[in-house]
């Protein structure tokens, strides 16, 4: 199962919110797990899209709070922006939507870790693959992501690892 991180600003514009909602829905449709920073804006919209479609959402939150209401799993870190490393490290691929300096830090970490990064109206940086639509970004992320050795969901009838 592919784990895709969706990163972007907590104070998303209406266009970024709509884009993130579509990205989350498409991740769920493609049986991916959505990883994010667990807060509002882009993160909340992506989680809502995935959750509404029956997908699994994981929020790695910066404090001891509960994150947004569309999270299936909440990981409380108490690390502040340091949790950005965990968000990116947990993912097989990253989709950046808009964003400010927090998003920039996550992109830099992802590139340093050789994670594939796909951007929708985000920072113009070498290594970030520009995508025009949510469909394009999710399809590219799913294709680029290697199978995750960090996480496995057992299917009905499948033997434990």
At which residue positions do the language-model features occur?
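Glycine-rich beta-alpha loop segments
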Residues: 1-58
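C-terminal binding/interaction regions
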Residues: 8-11, 80-147
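Short glycine-/acidic-enriched loop or helix-start segments at secondary-structure transitions
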Residues: 16, 45-47, 69, 105-107, ...
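Short, well-ordered alpha-helix to beta-strand connector turns
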Residues: 31, 71-72, 91, 114
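Short, ordered loop/turn segments at secondary-structure junctions
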Residues: 39-40, 62-65, 122-125
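Short hydrophobic/aromatic-enriched beta-strand-loop microsegments
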Residues: 53-62, 75-76, 117-120
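Glycine-rich oxoanion-binding loops at beta->alpha junctions
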Residues: 60-90
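Short Gly/Ser/Thr- and charged-rich N-terminal loops/segments
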Residues: 154-157
